[in-house]
Amino acid sequence: MLVIDALGRKCPIPIIMLAERIREIPVGQVVAVLADDPAAHTDVPAWCRMKSQEFVWEEPLPQGGWGFHIRRSY
């Protein structure tokens, strides 16, 4: 699984990193985005809806922030 570490970066940087790197994984695979900017909590799911990518789940990270899991749809 591809992990994108965007901890410490402010939005829209985590979204830009996701948009650039999701192409590195095959369709059907999952990418994890680690982010601690509160805006990412709404921006990542919104990006998935806009780009027709599957938002699988999110989990809180022990150090703060979230791990967002997105399945590449196309």
Give the location of each predicted region.
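C-terminal structural segments of small proteins and small subunits
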Residues: 44-74
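Conserved beta-strand segments of alpha/beta enzyme cores
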Residues: 2-3, 54
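Amphipathic, hydrophobic secondary-structure cores in small proteins
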Residues: 9-55
